[in-house]
Structure formats: structure tokens, C-alpha cells
Curated annotation (Swiss-Prot):
NCBIfam families: mnmG_gidA. GO terms for cellular component: cytosol. NAD-binding protein involved in the addition of a carboxymethylaminomethyl (cmnm) group at the wobble position (U34) of certain tRNAs, forming tRNA-cmnm(5)s(2)U34. Homodimer. Heterotetramer of two MnmE and two MnmG subunits. This is tRNA uridine 5-carboxymethylaminomethyl modification enzyme MnmG. It holds the Pfam family SAM_GIDA_C. It comes from Staphylococcus aureus (strain bovine RF122 / ET3-1).
């Protein structure tokens, strides 16, 4: 008997688990198929979650009802807030994961999720009827039927590991690759590209001389990604910093001809922002040294990840490199680094919901869409799961805008601009980064998560209480006038401020650069009554109010452009006035509104003006079929 589901998820990596959980949590009967049940949420590369921009994505996933934040909060070995000396727009949390515990915890969550079924199996083929997906067929001929399918195959599609002059079919960490499914996507007409990524050697902790390295401890205060976490792991393990040197670079230079990167063996495009050590040596040969972070892979293993030493050089050369690095001279290499090539689809073949334009009800998420990173994958998986379930259950899909979330920036970049290399999310990619902060992800997205059925009533009530406390405290400080008495003047001067000439509202005093919420309470002779996250919001929203309001005005302008919809089936070849390049790009991307059209590379303001004229005159309808 053929089994039927609402949604099938192919793959159980970081995109797959979020897709499966989101679909199930929205009420869809969901099946997750994966090559190996023991590798659910596996971390084949760095054992970490978060960092600049990426850490904010993890907070956004949590605010929308996803899982990654909760799981890393329970299984990390270290957590640090980055960029604390800078403004709130670029602060981000980063955690070192216990990669085995992370996998185990995520597998437990998936097994306990109602509506989510998991099965070990390799999908070889999609079942398609009239350009609509109807299910999948495995390598042993088993068929599973569904109303929607989400492909989250990571780097497994026609995966090939490259090490020196060796090249062989493999998924990450020497797992089985998925070859036939990649061929099936080509046969269906998808435009496929070849990308490459890599990983460094792992060494035995017992053989490292840590006295020659610099300790990198975690923060000594409780940190968490999830807004629901209340218990913090304070027993943390340190990381360690060391460097390459002239000796290391000589080993690389002497053996560069053996690197698959430079021998011509690697055809795929590698990630610009995570280059291999040989690539760094060639591109930045004026630098006398490069940072290397020694990151423990967990509490119950001796394996240490040498962050920054990603390489495809032969194993014996990797050993020679390690022997030149302070602290690693006698290190025992437990796993060699390698490069991996894999297939990805050109992401402009997707709608902003992550549904493919070519095949109805077929979605893709994660590295198959050309991204790099666990967090980028998880964010896409979450949205694909939300949208696939919403479509088949008729409960609504959701497109995050660039002003809603970094996840919105990520997806819009992919489907509007595409990518010719593994895409990494950066704070510089977000034009509204002062709005898209680590601290306010819940204020931006919890309402949305609740409307989508991803947030419980209890959690939503707590969130609303927090929001009301923030608003009430800002109003309270706006009504309190501080007198310029000696008590006040002494505290202000003590903190580097200039004396008051007249009375001032507490909220206006807080706007001064040297003032903090703590100092205001000291002046008012009050005790702390609110949670730290509420106080943080009061301070940030007050100090940056002018900048935030400017950003919100820009958002409103874009929203007006987003309201100018473009029919999906518009035939741009009928609009004679458009430039040839614009016509080609618009036909490829099929933007849903004028705002998206304006972000397409090759579409200039004159082309947008022509589209606007057609919209206003109603001519778009006459050239649509």
C-alpha cells in the first residue's frame, strides 16, 4: 500500500529538520526521508552556530517558532557575544557546539514531534504529473505520495570529495552521495551549477601544546539564542588561537601544484568568505600570518577542529603544515581536511516562497539553493516548511521582506539576484540592519510566528507582557523630570557627562551617549524592577530612535513599491520600450512587484519607470496571457 502525506522533506540536515518541524507544527502530515538516520542535523564542517548576521538568523528562527536556537542552547560548550564594543546593529551571538549532543538532541525533538514521521531512505526520483509534484520514489523503488515536496539535500547532490590528486563520489564526511536525484532534476529542466566547499583537518586535543596558543574563553554570563531559554550552561570549554607563519606558507608554496584548487581538478566555485588556506596564501600573500582557531568538537571527544585551515592538499602535506604551527608541532591528525564539490540549482528558478517556478508544489531549501552555512540553511528550511504546509492546507504562505528579517534578505538575494558562488549572509547585505538586530528579533517576528500557528498561547502571552513593559517604561521615563540638584550633577559628572543647566526629562537624559539605563535608575534612586532584556530595549529604542525612524521611513517607501504588483505570467517580450538585458532578466526572475524588480541586476531605473507607466495605465493586463 502506497503511503500518502501532505508534505515530504528530502534530507535531514539543518534545512531539512527546520522544514520538517515547521510543516508538522503547522498541522501537515509530514514525512522526512534521509540517507542515514544517525546523521540528522550533522555538522560536517565547523562545530559552531551563529556569528555576525548568522547569529541573528538563529534568533529569527526562534522568534518564528523554529528549533535551532533551543537545541544549541542545550548542547553548546561555549557561547560569546561578538562586537560588544560596537553598536547594536552588528552585535551577534556565537556558540561552539557539542556536535554529537546537538545531533542527538535534534533527533529526539524530531522523533517526539506530532505529525512528523522519519524514514531512512535515498530518494532517486520525483513523481511529477502535469508539472506538479505528486511524491517521490526511492532507490529501492518505494513510492511515497504527497501534495508538496521540499528538497534539502545539502552538499550530497553528485557530491565528490577531493584530496590532493584523489577524487571520488561521496557526500560530506564520506557518506553516500545522491547522484540519481541530481540527474532527475537535470532531466526535469532545472539549471544546475557546480559549487565547492571545504573542511580543515581535525587534531587530537591530547597532543596540542596549548601553552603556545592564546586562550579564547566564553562569556562568564549566561547567554542564549532562544527567547524561551531560562537555564544557562556556565560550565564552558575554551577555544584557542594560534597562527600560521612563514614556515607554514613555504610548505603551501612548495606543494601548491598538488592542491586540487590549483591543479584544475576542482571545477566548482568555492566560497569567497571562507577560502581554503592555499587560497588565502595566494590571494593575500602579503600577509605574514593567518589566524587559526582551535575549536573542541564536544565534551566527550578529543577531536579539535582547526578553524581557518580548510584545505584540499594531500594528507602528508597537511601533516607538514601542522608541524609548522605553534602548539600543533606534535599534533596527531585524526581526520584530514578535504574539499567537496556538489550540485546546486540556480536560485532565480524559485519564487520568494522557495517554491520552484517550473514544478508546482516543489520547494528547495539550504545548500541546494547555493548558500553556505548551517544558519542560512535552517532559515530557508523553516520558511519552506511554513510555506509548503500553508499551501497544501490552505492556511497561508509567508514571504519575509528585507525589512522583516535577515532571512528575508537572504531569500530575496537568492531569488532576485541569484549567486555565482556559495552565498554567505553578511550584515553588509542588509540595508535595514539597524532594524534587524539580535536584541529585537522577537519584537519583529513573534506576531508573525503566532499568526502562522508556530508560537504557543503561553509563549505569546509572555511576549505581549514584555512588549507592554517596554512601552510602559519608555512612557514613564518620558513623564519624569530630573532636577539639576547636586545628587544628579555628581552622578552625571562621575560618568563623564556635562552638568545640567536646567531640569531634563529622564528619557532625554538617557539619549546622551554616556548615559545608560542603569545610570538613570541611580539618579532616580530606584532599584531594578524589570528584566534585563526589557531594560536593554528601553535603552536601545531611546538612544537610536532618530536613526530607527529614518530607517522606518525608507521601509515605507519600499512598501509602497511592493504594493505595485506585477502579474506572474507577464510576457515582457511584448513591452517594446524595455532594454534587452532588462527584458531577459525580468523574464528569468519574474518579480512579483516593482520593489523586487528594482533589485534585479541589469534592470535600471529607466526600465522601472516603463514598468510603472504600464502599471498605472493598465497596459500590463493587456500584454499578460
Amino acid at each position: 500500500m502506497v503511503q500518502e502525506y501532505d508534505v515530504i522533506v528530502i534530507g535531514a540536515g539543518h534545512a531539512g529538520v527546520e522544514a520538517g518541524l515547521a510543516s508538522a507544527r503547522r498541522g501537515a502530515k509530514t514525512l522526512m526521508l534521509t540517507i542515514n538516520l544517525d546523521n540528522i542535523a550533522f555538522m560536517p564542517c565547523n562545530p559552531s552556530v551563529g556569528g555576525p548576521a548568522k547569529g541573528i538568523v538563529v534568533r529569527e528562527i526562534d522568534a518564528l517558532g523554529g528549533q535551532m536556537a533551543k537545541t544549541i542552547d542545550k548542547t553548546h560548550i561555549q557561547m560569546r557575544m561578538l562586537n560588544t564594543g560596537k553598536g547594536p546593529a552588528v552585535r551577534a551571538l556565537r556558540a561552539q557546539a557539542d556536535k554529537v549532543l546537538y545531533q542527538q538532541e535534534m533527533k529526539r525533538v524530531i522523533e517526539d514531534e506530532e505529525n512528523l514521521h522519519i524514514m531512512q531512505g535515498m530518494v532517486d526520483e520525483l513523481i511529477i504529473e502535469d508539472n506538479e509534484v505528486k511524491g517521490v520514489r526511492t532507490n529501492i523503488g518505494t513510492e511515497y505520495l504527497s501534495k508538496a515536496v521540499i528538497i534539502t539535500t545539502g552538499t550530497f547532490l553528485r557530491g565528490e570529495i577531493i584530496l590532493g590528486n584523489m577524487k571520488y563520489s561521496s557526500g560530506p564526511n564520506h557518506q553516500l552521495p545522491s547522484i540519481t536525484l541530481s540527474d532527475n532534476l537535470r532531466e526535469l529542466g532545472f539549471d544546475i551549477v557546480r559549487f565547492k566547499t571545504g573542511t580543515p583537518p581535525r587534531v587530537n586535543s591530547k597532543t596540542i601544546d596549548y601553552s603556545k596558543t592564546e586562550i579564547q574563553p566564553g562569556d562568564d554570563v549566561g547567554r542564549a539564542f532562544s527567547f524561551e531559554t531560562t537555564e544557562y550552561i556556565l560550565d564552558q570549554l575554551p577555544c584557542w588561537l594560534t597562527y600560521t607563519n612563514a614556515e607554514t606558507h613555504k610548505v603551501i608554496d612548495d606543494n601548491l601544484h598538488l592542491s586540487a584548487m590549483y591543479s584544475g581538478m576542482i571545477k566548482g566555485t568555492g566560497p569567497r568568505y571562507c577560502p581554503s588556506i592555499e587560497d588565502k596564501f595566494v590571494r593575500f600573500n602579503d600577509k605574514p600570518r593567518h589566524q587559526l582557531f582551535l575549536e573542541p568538537e564536544g565534551r566527550n571527544t578529543n577531536e579539535v577542529y582547526v578553524q581557518g585551515l580548510s584545505t584540499s592538499l594531500p594528507e602528508h602535506v597537511q601533516r607538514q603544515m601542522l608541524e609548522t604551527i605553534p602548539g600543533l608541532e606534535k599534533a596527531d591528525m585524526m581526520r584530514a581536511g578535504y574539499a567537496i564539490e556538489y550540485d546546486a540549482i540556480v536560485p532565480t528558478q524559485l519564487w520568494p516562497t522557495l517554491e520552484t517556478k517550473m514544478i508546482k508544489n516543489l520547494y528547495t531549501a539550504g545548500q541546494i539553493n547555493g548558500t553556505s552555512g548551517y544558519e542560512e540553511a535552517a532559515g530557508q528550511g523553516l520558511m519552506a516548511g511554513i510555506n509548503a504546509a500553508g499551501k497544501v492546507l490552505n492556511t497561508g504562505e509567508k514571504i519575509l521582506s528585507r525589512s522583516d528579517a535577515y532571512i528575508g534578505v537572504l531569500i530575496d538575494d537568492l531569488v532576485t539576484k541569484g549567486t555565482n558562488e556559495p552565498y554567505r549572509l553578511l550584515t553588509s547585505r542588509a540595508e535595514y540592519r539597524l532594524l534587524l538586530r539580535h536584541d529585537n528579533a522577537d519584537l519583529r517576528l513573534t506576531d508573525m510566528g503566532y499568526e502562522l500557528g508556530m508560537i504557543s498561547e503561553e509563549r505569546y502571552a509572555r511576549f505581549n507582557e514584555k512588549r507592554q513593559q517596554i512601552d510602559a517604561e519608555i512612557k514613564r521615563l518620558s513623564d519624569i523630570r530630573i532636577k539639576p540638584n547636586e545628587h544628579t550633577q555628581a552622578i552625571i559628572e562621575q560618568h563623564g557627562g556635562s552638568r545640567l543647566k536646567d531640569g531634563i526629562l529622564a528619557i532625554d537624559l538617557l539619549r546622551r551617549p554616556e548615559m545608560t539605563y542603569d545610570i538613570i535608575l541611580e539618579i532616580l534612586e530606584e532599584e531594578h524592577q524589570l528584566n534585563a532584556d526589557v531594560e536593554e530595549q528601553v535603552e536601545i529604542q531611546t538612544k537610536y530612535e532618530g536613526y530607527i525612524n529614518k530607517s522606518l521611513q525608507q521601509v515605507e517607501k519600499v512598501k509602497r513599491m511592493e504594493e505595485k504588483k506585477i502579474p506572474e505570467d507577464l510576457d515582457y517580450s511584448k513591452i517594446d520600450s524595455l532594454a534587452t538585458e532588462a527584458r531577459e532578466k525580468l523574464s528569468e526572475v519574474k518579480p512579483l512587484n516593482i520593489a523586487q524588480a528594482s533589485r534585479i541586476s541589469g534592470v535600471n531605473p529607466a526600465d522601472i519607470s516603463i514598468l510603472l507607466i504600464y502599471l498605472e495605465q493598465g497596459k500590463l493586463q493587456r500584454v499578460s496571457y
